[in-house]
């Protein structure tokens, strides 16, 4: 999954953002468990980027909900 930029998230509806958040959390969980089981994953920076993207999504989601 591609990393989402702020502009892309702002252009989404709240329902879309929540769906994307579920997908990102599932992907993070999969990567963390793969890292714990195998010890080595293909792209170790992916976990960090997923965490940052989740934080970005949550921040924008909270701002959008405060606007309404």
UniProtKB/Swiss-Prot annotation:
Q: Which GO terms describe its cellular component?
A: ribonucleoprotein complex; ribosome
Q: What is this protein called?
A: Large ribosomal subunit protein uL29
The record's annotation in InterPro entries points to: Ribosomal_uL29, Ribosomal_uL29_CS, Ribosomal_uL29_sf
Q: Which organism is it from?
A: Methanobrevibacter smithii (strain ATCC 35061 / DSM 861 / OCM 144 / PS)
Annotated keywords? Ribonucleoprotein, Ribosomal protein
Q: Does the keyword Magnesium apply?
A: no
One matching Pfam family is Ribosomal_L29
A GO molecular function held by the record: structural constituent of ribosome
What family does this chain come from, according to its entry? Answer: Belongs to the universal ribosomal protein uL29 family.
- Entry annotated with the keyword Metal-binding: no
CDD domains referenced in this protein's UniProt entry, alphabetically: Ribosomal_L29_HIP
* NCBIfam families cross-referenced by the UniProt entry: L29
Q: One GO biological process from the UniProt record?
A: translation
Superkingdom:
Archaea
Q: Which gene encodes it?
A: rpl29
């Amino acid at each position: 999954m591609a990393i989402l930029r702020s502009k892309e998230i702002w252009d989404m509806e709240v329902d879309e953002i929540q769906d994307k958040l579920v997908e990102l959390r599932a992907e993070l969980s999969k990567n963390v468990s793969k890292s714990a089981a195998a010890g080595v994953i293909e792209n170790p920076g992916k976990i960090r980027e997923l965490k940052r993207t989740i934080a970005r999504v949550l921040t924008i989601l909270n701002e959008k909900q405060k606007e309404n």
